[in-house]
Structure formats: C-alpha cells, structure tokens
C-alpha cells in the first residue's frame, strides 16, 4: 500500500531551461544559480513529519530532453505528485508539457485524485512573456490541476508551490510548514486529523 510508504515522491517535469532545477534547489537548499546546467536526473530529499512519524519528501528533478523516455515513465509510475513546469517566456515549453500530462494520465489512470501543479516559472521576466497567465489557468482547468506562477530567481511562490501541491493530496494529510508559522486554517485542520510538516 503506497500510503504506508515512508517517503512521498514528487516528480518535476518540463522542457530544458525552464528552471526545474532552479525551483527545486531554491526550495531544498535556498540557493539560485545563474548558469544553466542540463540535468539528467537528480533526487533531493527533505525530512518531514507525517501523522506523527518521520517520512521523506523525495523530489525528482527530471531531464528536460526527450532522450530518456524509460526514465520519464519510471518517474511517473513511482510518483505520488507532479509539478509540470514551463517558462512564461516560451510558448514551446508549455506545448511540450502536453504529451507529459497525457503520459501521466495513461500511466496513473484517474488523475483527479493525484496532486498536479502547472507552474509558469520565470515570472520575473514579464517583459518577455509569451504565455499569458489566463491561458495557463484555462489549461489547468482543462487538466483539472492547480496553477501558479513562480520565480526561482526572486524566490517568488517557491515554498508556496510545494505547500499548494501538498494541500492537493487527498489520500494523506500532508502540509508544509512555512517559516515555522502555521495559518489558523492549518491549526484547525491539525486539530481534526494528523498532519505532515517539513522539519
């Protein structure tokens, strides 16, 4: 039973250069690198507490190229939640997410119960925008997933992205504690049932 597994696996997909690694590194390590280094596949871990026991948030930063279809399928089949990243400065990068989403549907079946975030990164580069947020929001509604714009460079909406992703989890109660503060809504929920909190 995957719910009893002691890790929670999040896979990050998107075209090369959209900022997948930058988002993950900003979240896990609080760092940002200006130079682009293509990723084959990296996995990052953070210890979280889940329903009063320890588990691991495991984030797989996948390759942006299409050279490794078997690795992509494996990341989807093992994943509990998915982040689909495009750059707001590249319409092509949004188009490249469509076959990935279709593959998630094919492998996972009913995706309505699976946390998926559509993420428009590089919102700090608004003058070069090719994808309007309204267009991405419409696609997210079609895909029945959540949508957010982020900037790994400015650290805008990065923690919030992971918080929102965990909030979408329906089979388990998982939550990200941001800066040690909990909202009143979180506190109310915690009184009702167990919670996952990043340490």
UniProtKB/Swiss-Prot annotation:
<feature type="binding site">
    <location>
        <begin position="33"/>
        <end position="39"/>
    </location>
    <ligand>
        <name>GTP</name>
    </ligand>
</feature>
<feature type="propeptide" description="Removed in mature form">
    <location>
        <begin position="197"/>
        <end position="199"/>
    </location>
</feature>
<keyword id="KW-0342">GTP-binding</keyword>
<feature type="binding site">
    <location>
        <begin position="121"/>
        <end position="124"/>
    </location>
    <ligand>
        <name>GTP</name>
    </ligand>
</feature>
<dbReference type="InterPro" id="IPR027417">
    <property type="entry name" value="P-loop_NTPase"/>
</dbReference>
<protein>
    <recommendedName>
        <fullName>GTP-binding protein Di-Ras2</fullName>
        <ecNumber>3.6.5.-</ecNumber>
    </recommendedName>
</protein>
<dbReference type="InterPro" id="IPR020849">
    <property type="entry name" value="Small_GTPase_Ras-type"/>
</dbReference>
<dbReference type="Pfam" id="PF00071">
    <property type="entry name" value="Ras"/>
</dbReference>
<keyword id="KW-0488">Methylation</keyword>
<feature type="modified residue" description="Cysteine methyl ester">
    <location>
        <position position="196"/>
    </location>
</feature>
<feature type="lipid moiety-binding region" description="S-geranylgeranyl cysteine">
    <location>
        <position position="196"/>
    </location>
</feature>
<dbReference type="InterPro" id="IPR005225">
    <property type="entry name" value="Small_GTP-bd"/>
</dbReference>
<keyword id="KW-0597">Phosphoprotein</keyword>
<comment type="similarity">
    <text>Belongs to the small GTPase superfamily. Di-Ras family.</text>
</comment>
<keyword id="KW-0636">Prenylation</keyword>
<dbReference type="GO" id="GO:0005525">
    <property type="term" value="F:GTP binding"/>
</dbReference>
<keyword id="KW-0472">Membrane</keyword>
<feature type="modified residue" description="Phosphoserine">
    <location>
        <position position="35"/>
    </location>
</feature>
<keyword id="KW-0547">Nucleotide-binding</keyword>
<dbReference type="GO" id="GO:0003924">
    <property type="term" value="F:GTPase activity"/>
</dbReference>
<keyword id="KW-0832">Ubl conjugation</keyword>
<keyword id="KW-0378">Hydrolase</keyword>
<keyword id="KW-0449">Lipoprotein</keyword>
<dbReference type="GO" id="GO:0007165">
    <property type="term" value="P:signal transduction"/>
</dbReference>
<feature type="binding site">
    <location>
        <begin position="14"/>
        <end position="21"/>
    </location>
    <ligand>
        <name>GTP</name>
    </ligand>
</feature>
<feature type="binding site">
    <location>
        <begin position="61"/>
        <end position="65"/>
    </location>
    <ligand>
        <name>GTP</name>
    </ligand>
</feature>
<feature type="modified residue" description="Phosphoserine">
    <location>
        <position position="126"/>
    </location>
</feature>
<dbReference type="GO" id="GO:0005886">
    <property type="term" value="C:plasma membrane"/>
</dbReference>
<comment type="function">
    <text>Displays low GTPase activity and exists predominantly in the GTP-bound form.</text>
</comment>
<feature type="binding site">
    <location>
        <begin position="152"/>
        <end position="153"/>
    </location>
    <ligand>
        <name>GTP</name>
    </ligand>
</feature>
<feature type="short sequence motif" description="Effector region">
    <location>
        <begin position="36"/>
        <end position="44"/>
    </location>
</feature>
<dbReference type="InterPro" id="IPR001806">
    <property type="entry name" value="Small_GTPase"/>
</dbReference>
<keyword id="KW-1003">Cell membrane</keyword>
């Amino acid at each position: 039973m995957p719910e009893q597994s002691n890790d929670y696996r999040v896979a990050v997909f998107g075209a090369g250069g959209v900022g997948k690694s930058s988002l993950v590194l900003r979240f896990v390590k609080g760092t940002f690198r200006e130079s682009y280094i293509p990723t084959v596949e990296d996995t990052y871990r953070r210890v979280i507490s889940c329903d009063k026991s320890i588990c691991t948030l495991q984030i797989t930063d996948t390759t942006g190229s299409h050279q490794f279809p078997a690795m992509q399928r494996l990341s989807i089949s093992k994943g509990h939640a998915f982040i689909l990243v495009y750059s707001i400065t590249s319409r092509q990068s949004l188009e490249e997410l469509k076959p990935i989403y279709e593959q998630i549907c094919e492998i996972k079946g009913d995706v309505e119960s699976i946390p998926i975030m559509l993420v428009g990164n590089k919102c700090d580069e608004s003058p070069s925008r090719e994808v309007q947020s309204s267009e991405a929001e419409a696609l997210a509604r079609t895909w029945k997933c959540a949508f957010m714009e982020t900037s790994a460079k400015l650290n805008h909406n990065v923690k919030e992205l992971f918080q929102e992703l965990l909030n979408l989890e329906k089979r388990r109660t998982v939550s990200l504690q941001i800066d040690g503060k909990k909202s009143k809504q979180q506190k109310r929920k915690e009184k009702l049932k167990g919670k996952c909190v990043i340490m």
